[in-house]
Amino acid sequence: MRATVRVYGLLLVAGFRRGSTYRLAALGGLVSNVTFGLLKVAVLFAAVGAAGGEVGGYDRAQMSTYIWLSQAMLGSVNFFGGSDIAERIKDGQVSVDFLRPLDVQAATVVTEVGQALFAFVPRGIPQLAIGGLFVGMTLPGSVAVWVLGVVSLLLAVVLSAATVYLVAAVGFWLVETRGVQLVYMVVSGFFAGLFVPISMFPRWLELAVQATPFPSMLMYPVTVLADRVSVGGALTLVAVQVAWLAGVGGLGQVLTRAGRRRLEIQGG
């Protein structure tokens, strides 16, 4: 057991180091995210002003916090649907992964999480600093909410990686998964609240979106860290994230085992 945990720890570190090899890309991502963040500030601040100082339950300060937190998470939460494991499934190299004494799904998710965590260093943290310095942000006043916010943030990253793994696992049955990835890219960002807070949606759409795992990937950690909920409310959101992670992880196991059987039947 201890050896297995150590191996997954090494995979996490390997993913982190892999992310560090793309420093110029990270810098480009930072510039792009800050630029779009400033555009969102202009648009959403105008919406707040037009609504009389509050829209969707967000005042100007909370809207700024939403903007910069969501932008800071862009490098770590995969809304594009692409992954290395998708390519390995497509070209058959995943058969080698199945020969290793590791769970393919867990190893993939852990590695992706390591890479995502690195992105917070050159992209996430600087964006929060820029947003806080030049625009202003509201932050939790309670240590408990801070802790729950960080936990929620980590759960969002893991849930994102686990959900993208499901997109890749469809490749056991489809020759090409780019169409699935495209649908995921369109739906996930919108439903996660990447463009506007989901509280600005019509009520029926907000309820429908809350029945998906996507708000747990961005909206819920932002809600907690923007100090919009009490400790009890934060605990509830974290519990929802844990439930979605368990469900997505379980479905990933089912698809992995079924995909492996299909691979063995077709490939010998």
Ranges and model annotations:
Residues 1-268:
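Hydrophobic transmembrane alpha-helices and immediately adjacent juxtamembrane helices
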